[in-house]
A protein has these predicted regions:
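Membrane-cytosol interface segments
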Residues: 1-140, 396-421
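Histidine- and acidic-residue-rich, metal-dependent catalytic cores
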Residues: 113-421
Length: 421
């Protein structure tokens, strides 16, 4: 039954700027990645026409001048100032893609986890030791970091989902330690997705691990302040980039590519970043990768002045910065890494069961592997079984199993950080 705000519209009558709230079929049977989106252009209309006969348009969210009785062709070129979701993924092919290294998972996530747990724990301890030593004698031991990154790269190459799972399950006794390791994991994983060679992955992992070492030169009270920073405090905080670069240059054994990566990882596509206000192609590629890894991990972490947001919320927020804070193509590729329902997300299936996403299916991002936590009656299961939504299509009467919606962190009292497989 149609509501007053959601009107059934034939796809032949769609216009740019309309907000598509529902389809005439399950979202998972289409390539539209998010459930609900604004129509941006004719390409979006043609994609909808290809997959659907009709859709439901929410006219409260659509611009007021749009009606469902008349199509105004002149509005086809209207600029959409707010796109709230990534919705349609097209193949991304460039000349450089032909030279990229193609990596294939060589271990299932469950098997890789047994190794990754040790690697992750040792990495966190190594970073803690490195920071402690730096604070005591002012010397940055780069060799510790290099030896730490090596097994992290190897684990990500075998199966990135294991390290991603552990990064998502991180504890918060020290944000700085865990953020360094987790950002390194995301940077390596992103580089793997882009097809960079192993040497480049080592550089990215090392740069992401060390890009915040300059914060050891900042007042502890500033780093742990629970309120938003003042303008003066923010200016002081920004100095950590220069401190990090100076420490790396003084330590030796660091490539120029890593130095430029660390210096520019807070630069933004529109020129609003720091310290040099670089924009667009002025920003080094490795810095773009590091900036994305840093941003995503920060959003999904508990910080002194900000509570964590779910991976799904982080994806939506980062996508809203597409073309402004971050280069559009970089965002789109990173979305392919984290998935529509990122690892660690709490989700509700169409059966009513509640699960946590534990791994991605690269071929079908809408069909990840999940671990069942609650049954269809929201009762905690005695055993947490894993289900591959791409292949395990029959469960408790759900003839075709899919993710119905993403849940907020902490829904039904579930803390994903306490779950292990």
């Amino acid at each position: 039954m149609e509501s007053q705000k959601q009107i059934k519209v034939n796809t032949a009558d769609l216009e740019p700027s309309m907000y598509v709230a529902r389809l005439d079929r399950p979202w998972t049977e289409t390539p539209f990645l998010f459930q609900g989106f604004f129509i941006r252009n004719q390409d979006d209309i043609e994609a909808l026409q290809h997959h659907c006969q009709y859709v439901y348009v929410d006219f409260e969210q659509s611009p007021k001048e749009i009606t469902h009785t008349k199509t105004d062709v002149s509005r086809e070129n209207r600029t959409i100032t707010q796109i709230t979701s990534l919705h349609y993924a097209k193949p991304h092919t460039t000349a450089s893609n032909r030279n990229r290294t193609v990596y294939v998972n060589s271990q299932p996530v469950e098997k890789e986890l047994s190794v990754a747990r040790t690697v992750y724990a040792e990495a966190n301890q190594a970073v803690a030791d490195l920071i402690t030593k730096l604070e005591v004698d002012g010397r940055l031991d780069v060799q510790i970091a290099k030896e730490t990154v090596e097994p992290m790269v190897e684990s990500v190459l075998r199966n990135p989902d294991a390290m991603i799972w552990l990064a998502r399950m991180k504890k918060y006794d020290s944000y700085m330690y865990h953020h360094s390791v987790s950002s390194s994991i995301w940077g390596i994983t992103f580089g793997r997705h882009l097809g960079l060679d192993k040497s480049a992955l080592h550089e990215i992992g090392l740069g992401c691990m060390l890009f915040d070492v300059g914060k050891t030169k900042l007042p502890h009270a500033l780093l742990t302040k629970a309120d938003q920073l003042t303008k003066t405090e923010w200016h002081v905080m920004r100095n950590h980039v220069d401190y990090s670069v100076n420490l790396l240059e003084g330590a030796g054994g660091i490539t120029e590519r890593i130095i430029s990566m660390v210096r520019s990882h807070h630069e933004r596509h529109d020129g609003s970043g720091y310290p040099d206000k670089l924009k667009e192609n002025q920003i080094p590629t490795f810095a773009k990768i590091a900036g994305m890894a840093d941003c995503y991990d920060a959003i999904t972490s508990t910080r002194p002045y900000s509570k964590l947001r779910s991976p799904y919320e982080a994806v939506r927020e980062i996508y809203s910065w597409r073309g402004t804070l971050f280069q559009a193509e970089v965002v789109e590729q990173f979305m392919q890494v984290v998935g529509v329902f990122p690892t660690g997300s709490l989700v509700e299936l169409n059966s009513g069961a509640v699960a946590v996403v534990i791994a991605q299916n690269e071929a079908r991002r809408l069909k990840p592997r999940v671990m069942l936590i609650l049954d269809e009656n929201k009762k905690r299961l005695p055993q947490f079984n894993t289900v591959d939504l791409l292949f395990d299509t029959h469960l408790k009467g759900a003839e075709n199993l899919w993710i119905e919606k993403c849940l907020e962190s902490g829904a039904y009292g579930i803390d994903p950080q306490e779950l292990y497989i």
